[in-house]
Amino acid sequence: MPAYFQRPENALKRANEFLEVGKKQPALDVLYDVIKSKKHRTWQKIHEPIMLKYLELCVDLRKSHLAKEGLYQYKNICQQVNIKSLEDVVRAYLKLAEEKTETAKEESQQMVLDIEDLDNIQTPESVLLSAVSGEDTQDRTDRLLLTPWVKFLWESYRQCLDLLRNNSKVERLYHDIAQQAFKFCLQYTRKAEFRKLCDNLRMHLGQIQRHHNQSTAINLNNPESQSMHLETRLVQLDSAISMELWQEAFKAVEDIHGLFALSKKPPKPQLMANYYNKVSTVFWKSGNALFHSCTLHRLYHLSREMRKNLTQEEMQRMSTRVLLATLSIPITPERTDIARLLDMDGIIVEKHRRLATLLGLQSPPTRQSLINDMVRFNLLQYVVPEVKELYNWLEVDFHPLKLCGRVTKVLNWVRDQAEKESDLQQYVPHLQNNTILRLLQQVAQIYQSIEFSRLASLVPFVDAFQLERSIVDAARHCDLQVRIDHSSRTLSFGSDLNYSTKEDSPVGPFLQNMPSEQIRNQLTAMSSSLAKAIQVIKPASILQDHEEQRQQAITAYLKNARKEHQRILARRQTIEERKERLESLNIQREKEELEQREAELQKVRKAEEERLRQEAKEREKERIMQEHEQIKKKTVRERLEQIKKTELGAKAFKDIDIEDLEELDPDFIMAKQVEQLEKEKKELQERLKNQEKKIDYFERAKRLEEIPLIKKAYEEQRIKDMELWELQEEERITNMKMEREKALEHKQRMSRMMEDKENFLSKIKAARSFIYEEKLKQFQERLVEERKKRLEERKKQRKEDRRKAFYHQKEEEAQRIREEQLKKEREERERLEQEQREEEEREYQERLRKLEEQERKQRARQQEIEERERRKEEERRAPEEKPNKEWAEREESGWRKRGEGESEWRRPVPDRDWRQEGREGREEPDREDRDLPFRRGGESARRGASDEKGLRRGCDDDRGPRRGGDDERPPRRGFDDDRGTRRGFDDDRGQRRGDDDRGPRRGMDDDRGPRRPIDDDRGPRRSDDDRGPRRGFDDDRGPRRGMDEPRGPRRGADDDWGPRRGGDDERGGRRGMDDSGPRRGEDSRPWKPLGRPGAGGWREREKAREESWGPPRDSGHDDDGGERDGDDQREGERFRERRSAREEGSAWRRGGGGGGGGEEQSSWRDSRREDFDREDRRERRDMRERRDDRERDIRGPQRDQDEGGSWRRGGEERREERKEERDAPPRPRERDRDSGEKSTWRSDKDKENPRRTKNETDDDGWTTVRR
């Protein structure tokens, strides 16, 4: 390729310029570069003329390989855009090649070429022959002129067929070119090229069947494709018959039959008729008269069934030909001595089976079967009368003396029809041979011996030599018993009595058997003759004996008939079963053998396929490598040639030879080319720069020299312009004066006609004034009418507009009234709902107040009873302090001695006033938050789905009853106990302490026990518990904090919480199941988990727990005994996991809406919430400790499992601790510590779905969670 790139239009102009000066090769190179260029791979309109010019040059220069490469490139360019352009280009290319070949043929006198193969024009034999014999001028002219063009045309056909194969878009063009190639072979008698063309077409068809998955592949199931292929194959068959290439014709027949098999629909009758006609010719030329006749039979039946316009003459001609062809089939079997010796019967049978398949027959035909079909279909009635009796003479009648004379008449008639029926002449020799054979068969049945001259006189249409040859062939192939005696010139028949005829001996007219047949059947004939004689001469006694024997036989038969019948049936059944068993065994064995053979064949086939695949892969790899090498060499050569064309490139590569291309590297060539381009660019820049300087100097000098000249020329031009202006001005003044004089003359002449003009105008106005007044009057009348009409229409329109406006206003008023009515009804309904809610709130507050009063009284009674029981217990336990001395000796392991006082945080507070102040206003609202409503299903009211603790009162609990009838424990509180009451006597929840800041109770993940009413001493709820609600349906919880509290909806129909505030209540869910925030009245500060307790004492651990502001980890004092130790530890681990931020927007933390501050929106309960909660937790904790002491006293001392645990100590030590605690002054409550911390309890749902939160704490300790 050149260093520069040309546009296609410029390349075409450049090529035409080369052609004008007679340079075809440079023009071809220019067009070749454009076609090979990768920058124009998209088809454009200019590509077609470029390609036509390129192919024209290829034809003129006979460059078939360049034409092939260009066509392939053009196919890639236009295949997806304009395939019609490719068709036009290919047709134009072939047309040019054909015209050039025809021109060369006209100039040459050689009509038929003597060259066998155009691919190998000069064979060694032809070279030697030309050297020995020499050649004249004409022969040399023919060889140099016609042969190259014929070869070029053949290569053009072959290249175009390879280009267009297996492409559905150009399928029609492909078949047209194939048919043109057949005509070319027929025109120039190119047999070798015809064979190659047939092989190529067969190979292309195989490729179509293999590569049918390609995008442009031909679909052989398409009827149009099948018809085009059949048409091409029929042309091939016709050409092969014309060129007498019978082997190729037979292959074409097989190809046509294969196409028939591919087609799902039957072929057209016209196509099948043409096919049968061609096949019959092929069979006759191959010497197979049997299948030739069978083909004519098929053609005859097809014509009778499908042709509606079949004339009587055509039917007569076809039936006559079928009759002659059938009778012309040789009577003797077509088998030579060599075939008999080599045992080729199987091969012959297989050949006949294949030929029968080509005709669509299930089994091969025979001569006798064809004759029977001819008789069965009554074909003889359509035969011409001259030939009609030929069948009877040869196949039915037995008349040897007149046979040849009758047949001679028919043969003479056939010869006379040579001009009309030329196809019938080919049957005459075969009919003569069959007639001679029939004559010999019939003569052999009559005569024992006959003279040769006598026999020759019976066969007038052959000479003696042919007759003798026929006799010998009949004796050898036809089982004819004949001997020729040349000494006496006689023939003897049936002289060999030991001769036995074969099974396939021909059958014909029969009179009697031969002597050998009589000798072979002599005993049978003698037996039948003797039986007849005995029947004639035997006496009556013999007949009577025979009758008696017959009667005895009948009697015996009747006696044993049934048994014999059963035996025969049984034997038949046995035979059938045995045959079936043998047959099944044979079938099974054959099946196994078949499977084994198939497996072996499959294995061999797979191995062969794998081998072929590997070989193909290796060949493909080798081919790709060779192509890459060739492309590399070609690229190196092209680049080297391009660089050498330049001056610098010639200097750089002057020492490199083209033959050394294998050692060159394309990168090296590219580097050289780039270097050469850079040098050229630099040289050009320097040259331009020097020229620029020269031009600048020259231009400056030139302008300096021309300045005075320009001034001088300017002055001269100015003087000339002034003179010209003065001259023109004088001429203008003179012309104006002349024009004024002419105008004055014209005015004087026209003024004389002014009077006539005035008179004419006055007459015209007088005549037309009346018409004007009439038209004006009519116009005024029409104007008045039109004005009235329009005013009336305007009035109607205004009236219609007012009516529409009135109705529209009326509808709007009605709509407004309806909306006001709906608004009033909605406001009234909201007012009634508000009143109802307020009434329910007042009733709820009243009921709550009564319940609080009742609970207060009950709590006082309980305190008095518990105090009394405690004192009795202390008095009873006092004498038993000494035996428990051993428990006090382990102080170093964390147990407190009896003499020690209780810890400060357990010591009761002396005065009771500070515990009770403000209690009346807070106690019941707090109760509302600490108690949950009645829950259906019997499950625990406080425990969630993730509660891992056991039941508080399980069936396997070994502790004593809580408050049974036989419980001897004293009451929990006395009358002087100033602590707040627990919610029930046997509340089994973990005790709360004064500094206990655990999170609020929750629904699903709360691990604390359920709270109970005052008088409920039952265990926790279970799944099958059918007890009543915890607090009854008169739930005494406080009212909701506000109208817009965003708590969740009610849980069910039996929910006894306070009423909803209205239809627009947007509160969140109740805090029983999924409320993740703390409840009102609880301490919102989180607890801090402790580590594993060390070896210190009880007070040290309690002090550490108090400092951590969290519940104890290792000393959980609840009523579950030792079974709670592991649970407490696991709960300590889960506390860390559940400490996460609660969902934002929970308005229960702020006491109202979430928008304002906490002080303005909190309710009346929030002021002293924390003091009351801390007191209540401390009271419940003390009550739990006393109950545990009583239980331990009953069970006796236990062996401590964990020295660091405080829940295993005896009751005596704990009583001492409680005494010390009561005597010690109370610790100041740290109620405001860690007020900014938030509760971090989480439910399982919260653990699974963590959310990003932001917590804010106000002055009162309320935490607001924002999203």
Curated annotation (Swiss-Prot):
Disordered: annotated segments: 792-1267
Protein name: Eukaryotic translation initiation factor 3 subunit A
Keyword match Cytoplasm: yes
Localization of this protein: Cytoplasm
Major localisation: cytoplasm
Comp. bias intervals (Basic and acidic residues): 792-835, 844-1086, 1098-1147, 1162-1256
Gene from which this protein is expressed: eif3a
Main function: RNA-binding component of the eukaryotic translation initiation factor 3 (eIF-3) complex, which is involved in protein synthesis of a specialized repertoire of mRNAs and, together with other initiation factors, stimulates binding of mRNA and methionyl-tRNAi to the 40S ribosome. The eIF-3 complex specifically targets and initiates translation of a subset of mRNAs involved in cell proliferation.
MF terms in GO: mRNA binding; translation initiation factor activity
Segments of this protein annotated with the region 12 X 10 AA approximate tandem repeats of D-[DE]-[DE]-R-[GP]-[GPQT]-R-R-[GPS]-[ADFGIM]: 956-1073
Sequence ranges assigned to domain PCI in this UniProt record: 315-498
UniProt keyword Protein biosynthesis, yes or no: yes
Residue spans of biased composition, Gly residues class: 1150-1159
Coiled coil: 82-118
Annotated Gene Ontology cellular component terms: eukaryotic 43S preinitiation complex; eukaryotic 48S preinitiation complex; eukaryotic translation initiation factor 3 complex; eukaryotic translation initiation factor 3 complex, eIF3e; eukaryotic translation initiation factor 3 complex, eIF3m; multi-eIF complex
Complex formation: Component of the eukaryotic translation initiation factor 3 (eIF-3) complex, which is composed of 13 subunits: eif3a, eif3b, eif3c, eif3d, eif3e, eif3f, eif3g, eif3h, eif3i, eif3j, eif3k, eif3l and eif3m.
Lineage, uppermost ranks: Eukaryota, Metazoa, Chordata, Craniata, Vertebrata
HAMAP family tied to this protein: eIF3a
Swiss-Prot/TrEMBL keywords: Coiled coil, Cytoplasm, Initiation factor, Protein biosynthesis, Repeat, RNA-binding
PROSITE patterns found in the cross-reference section: PCI (PS50250)
Stated family: Belongs to the eIF-3 subunit A family.
A GO BP annotation: translation reinitiation
Sequence repeats mapped onto the chain: 956-965, 966-975, 976-985, 986-994, 995-1004, 1005-1014, 1015-1023, 1024-1033, 1034-1043, 1044-1053, 1054-1063, 1064-1073
